[in-house]
Amino acid sequence: MKEGKRKSSRLQSEAAGAGSSRKLDLDGVAAERQERNGYPEDAGSKCEEEPVAGEGEGEGEEKDEAPEVVRVEKGDGDGVAKKVKPKLAEGFYEIETVRRRRTVKGKVYYLIKWRGWPESANTWEPETNLSSCTDIIDAYEESLKSGKLRRRKRKFGATQTHPMIKQQRRFSAPVATYNGPAVKVRIIEEPTPSPPLNVLKATDLVDSNGSELNSKVDEVVNGNGLRLREQNELNLKLSELKGATSTNGNPVDISGNGLTNGFPKVNGAEFYQSDRCTGAKKRKSGCVRRFKRETTSAVKDDTQDALAGGPLATFMQDGSHNHVMVADDSKDGYTITQLVNPVSYKASFSNDMLDVSVTFVAKRADGNLVLVDNKFLKMNNPLLLINFYEENMRYHPTE
């Protein structure tokens, strides 16, 4: 009987204890619901003005970290266990994550996303206000470091691919130039410089037999300093030359047998033809007429130079007579038709050789008589000179 009474007393005591604990649990839940009335400050407020803890508490005071309490509610069926979040102190709120990090005037701030609040309620909190959440800050810093390493790897990979693209473009560029249209290249040849026209040497004259003439000119004759006695005589010679060419109807021969109006090409009219202009471009068709006019003037200058430096100049310097007639004949040597008779004879030694100069009176086609020497006839009318020698040659046998 005693044992039965003891068991019943134990059951009654346990039931009374369970009823009291249930009453305490319900009172605690109601009190928790009534006490949660704190809210975080607005997002636009400055980070420096946000309080770390509630009024009356120190800045370094941490929130109360109460262990999770497992409470059992007993109903019709079996008891169900529920986890209830611990109560936070006044002024403390739960952090969901860290969004960004910045440094202002040497102080580090973090953009905090609060749990249960929208993104517009995010605030920048200084590092001192987050001293109780060092684990969240450390995790965020590690994620930043890992993110920087990933970005660097991506940058290195991108820099390795870009040079290959540039190299391909560089190699492909010359190929495009080779496939371009053909380009015409014009090679411009500069005219060969002609020798000075005012330098005359009688040693450059060669007769028909290939022997050099022995006459020499000791001076260099300029274009304006011809070795003539009077300017009036020169003008007279030019006028007579024009009259002779107009009456005979013979065109001026520039490239015929190396002669120019009966004279050898001392300076050569070909130099005027080759040296068309100082430039390198070709002349147009309109400039050819000007070139022809220059050739005629060049022939005139050439005849004047030949008068000053030719073999007749030596004969004129020797003091022979009628030098005007010789000059007239020298300008048109092909018009001589007959040798009348010899006038003078002169022998000289040159290079240990005997040089004989014979002066003849010749008749031109227009009937005028002129004086010519044998050297001039050898170059221009060799057949006429040979016929004269054959007709007038006399053989005297030696005794």
Curated annotation (Swiss-Prot):
Record's compositionally biased regions (Acidic residues): 50-65
Keyword set, alphabetical order: Chromatin regulator, Nucleus, Repeat, Repressor, Transcription, Transcription regulation
Subunit text: Homodimer. Interacts with H3.
UniProt subcellular location: Nucleus
Cellular component terms per the entry's GO annotation: heterochromatin; nucleus
Note: Heterologous expression in Arabidopsis shows an additional localization at specific nucleolar compartments and a cell-type dependent subnuclear localization.
SMART domains: CHROMO, ChSh
Free-text domain note: The chromo domain specifically binds to dimethylated H3 'Lys-9' while the chromo shadow domain is required for dimerization.
Region feature (Disordered): 1-72
Protein name, as recorded: Chromo domain protein LHP1
GO biological process: heterochromatin formation
Pfam families documented for this protein: Chromo
PROSITE patterns associated with the record: CHROMO_1, CHROMO_2
Compositional bias (Basic and acidic residues): 22-49
Location, primary (coarse class): nucleus
UniProt function note: Structural component of heterochromatin involved in gene repression. Recognizes and binds histone H3 tails methylated at 'Lys-9', leading to epigenetic repression.
Chromo domain boundaries: 93-152, 332-396
Top-level taxon of the source organism: Eukaryota
Record-linked CDD domains: CD_CSD, CSD
